[in-house]
Amino acid sequence: AAQALGRALVSAKWLSEAVRAGRVGAGLRVLDASWYPPEERDARQEFKERHIPGASFFNIEECRDKSSPYDFMLPSEAHFADYVGRLGVSNDTHVVVYDGDELGTFYAPRAWWMFRAFGHREVSVLNGGFKNWVKEGHPVTAEPSQPAEAVFKAKLDKTLLKTFEQAMENVGSKKFQVVDSRPAGRFQGTELDQGLESGHIPGAVNMPFSTFLTESGHEKSIEEIQQMFREKKVDLSKPLTATCRKGVTACHIALAAYLCGKPDVAVYDGSWSEWFHRAPPQYKVTELK
């Protein structure tokens, strides 16, 4: 079981050996899941210019529920299956996801969690991300890859997903612990969250996602992560749901807990962007006076 759980992260060394050995193909697919605010960086353009050999671009803007008023909500089973099938991913493919964020990893855990939410277990995040891949001198290319289409069957695992109604009910029942991965100022309500007044769900504990990464942008050790959860009095033997602003960085909490042997962390997909619009005022905790 430890080995199976350990696959949630792969090292740049492991992946570069797989690339050099020509293993990228039907059995191993590499996906760049980068997303940046459009005014800052163009993820697709950067991918075209430079990516891991054999990688495809996993577009989080495309692979989502476009009918939702909230950003980046989980797509339907059929949409996800069709989308990843076109990237050459079948149910037997080992998928490795990465992104090019300067932190090391930002959006990749969201893609990792999406695959898991749709029943795919063989999925890993590249530890250290593209930033460290380049820094360590591993190969990059501008060559587009043309993966042969594959058939992917998606089955949503509802235990990994929480809705607004479940999160509301939990404020009273406290059936599950809630960890919020946003920066402290947004959690406390002292700084604006991209135009939204900020704050948090009553009872939530704050563990900013960047605190799970080392200065170099790698995931902290399992011992360090376990200590972080202990310090916040989060019990990994009990139900846990992660939240953030739009369901992206919450997936860092799911990944961190997974590395500690807890694979069942749910993500509240709507997160603060939905909570802000739908929850009654007394359900929005803020330190702003």
Swiss-Prot record:
<keyword id="KW-0677">Repeat</keyword>
<feature type="binding site">
    <location>
        <position position="186"/>
    </location>
    <ligand>
        <name>substrate</name>
    </ligand>
</feature>
<keyword id="KW-0808">Transferase</keyword>
<keyword id="KW-0694">RNA-binding</keyword>
<dbReference type="GO" id="GO:0051029">
    <property type="term" value="P:rRNA transport"/>
</dbReference>
<dbReference type="InterPro" id="IPR001763">
    <property type="entry name" value="Rhodanese-like_dom"/>
</dbReference>
<feature type="region of interest" description="Hinge">
    <location>
        <begin position="143"/>
        <end position="158"/>
    </location>
</feature>
<dbReference type="GO" id="GO:0008097">
    <property type="term" value="F:5S rRNA binding"/>
</dbReference>
<dbReference type="InterPro" id="IPR036873">
    <property type="entry name" value="Rhodanese-like_dom_sf"/>
</dbReference>
<dbReference type="GO" id="GO:0035928">
    <property type="term" value="P:rRNA import into mitochondrion"/>
</dbReference>
<feature type="domain" description="Rhodanese 2">
    <location>
        <begin position="172"/>
        <end position="284"/>
    </location>
</feature>
<dbReference type="InterPro" id="IPR045078">
    <property type="entry name" value="TST/MPST-like"/>
</dbReference>
<comment type="function">
    <text>Together with MRPL18, acts as a mitochondrial import factor for the cytosolic 5S rRNA. Only the nascent unfolded cytoplasmic form is able to bind to the 5S rRNA. Formation of iron-sulfur complexes and cyanide detoxification.</text>
</comment>
<dbReference type="GO" id="GO:0005739">
    <property type="term" value="C:mitochondrion"/>
</dbReference>
<comment type="subunit">
    <text>Monomer.</text>
</comment>
<protein>
    <recommendedName>
        <fullName>Thiosulfate sulfurtransferase</fullName>
        <ecNumber>2.8.1.1</ecNumber>
    </recommendedName>
</protein>
<dbReference type="Pfam" id="PF00581">
    <property type="entry name" value="Rhodanese"/>
</dbReference>
<dbReference type="GO" id="GO:0016784">
    <property type="term" value="F:3-mercaptopyruvate sulfurtransferase activity"/>
</dbReference>
<feature type="binding site">
    <location>
        <position position="246"/>
    </location>
    <ligand>
        <name>substrate</name>
    </ligand>
</feature>
<dbReference type="GO" id="GO:0004792">
    <property type="term" value="F:thiosulfate-cyanide sulfurtransferase activity"/>
</dbReference>
<feature type="active site" description="Cysteine persulfide intermediate">
    <location>
        <position position="244"/>
    </location>
</feature>
<feature type="domain" description="Rhodanese 1">
    <location>
        <begin position="24"/>
        <end position="142"/>
    </location>
</feature>
<dbReference type="InterPro" id="IPR001307">
    <property type="entry name" value="Thiosulphate_STrfase_CS"/>
</dbReference>
<keyword id="KW-0496">Mitochondrion</keyword>
<dbReference type="GO" id="GO:0005759">
    <property type="term" value="C:mitochondrial matrix"/>
</dbReference>
